[in-house]
Amino acid sequence: MPTIQQLIRSGRSIKASKTASPALEKCPQKRGVCTRVYTTTPKKPNSALRKVARVRLSNKIEVTAYIPGEGHNLQEHSIVLIRGGRVKDLPGVRYHIVRGSLDTSGVADRKQSRSKYGAKQPKAGAAAPAKGKGR
């Protein structure tokens, strides 16, 4: 605890808050080019093959970004848009790829939470899902 004389001399220092996604440099999203698209396994106790991509951003920083949703069309040299948001069971993955923008296609046949996965509204002629979720 500082003395009053020390506070008069220097005052209280404000703690600088650390950002969870430093590569975005305070931008909401950033564009980048995929340098490698691969699958990786999550931490214990989970088990899966999570799809991730190594992305070189427009500010020359290279990050690992998660590809959400089922199926994707990304390969090396694909141009992607990334946003912040970590994946809890993948160490070092602190960014998400935005589906449905730039070279990334939206998730096919997605009926719910469509806006999060860049899926268009299904045509009215298609069989509408029954209300009540199968009850």
Curated annotation (Swiss-Prot):
Pfam families for the chain: Ribosom_S12_S23
GO molecular function term, any single one: structural constituent of ribosome
Chain positions covered by the region annotation Disordered: 101-135
Compositional bias per record (Low complexity), positions renumbered to this chain: 118-135
Keyword Cell membrane carried by entry: no
Gene Ontology CC annotation, any one: small ribosomal subunit
Alphabetical keyword list: Methylation, Ribonucleoprotein, Ribosomal protein, RNA-binding, rRNA-binding, tRNA-binding
Presence of keyword Ribonucleoprotein: yes
Domain of life: Bacteria
CDD domains: Ribosomal_S12
Modified residues (3-methylthioaspartic acid): 89
GO biological process, one term: translation
Function summary: With S4 and S5 plays an important role in translational accuracy. Interacts with and stabilizes bases of the 16S rRNA that are involved in tRNA selection in the A site and with the mRNA backbone. Located at the interface of the 30S and 50S subunits, it traverses the body of the 30S subunit contacting proteins on the other side and probably holding the rRNA structure together. The combined cluster of proteins S8, S12 and S17 appears to hold together the shoulder and platform of the 30S subunit.
Complex formation: Part of the 30S ribosomal subunit. Contacts proteins S8 and S17. May interact with IF1 in the 30S initiation complex.
Protein family (similarity comment): Belongs to the universal ribosomal protein uS12 family.
Protein name: Small ribosomal subunit protein uS12
Name of encoding gene: rpsL
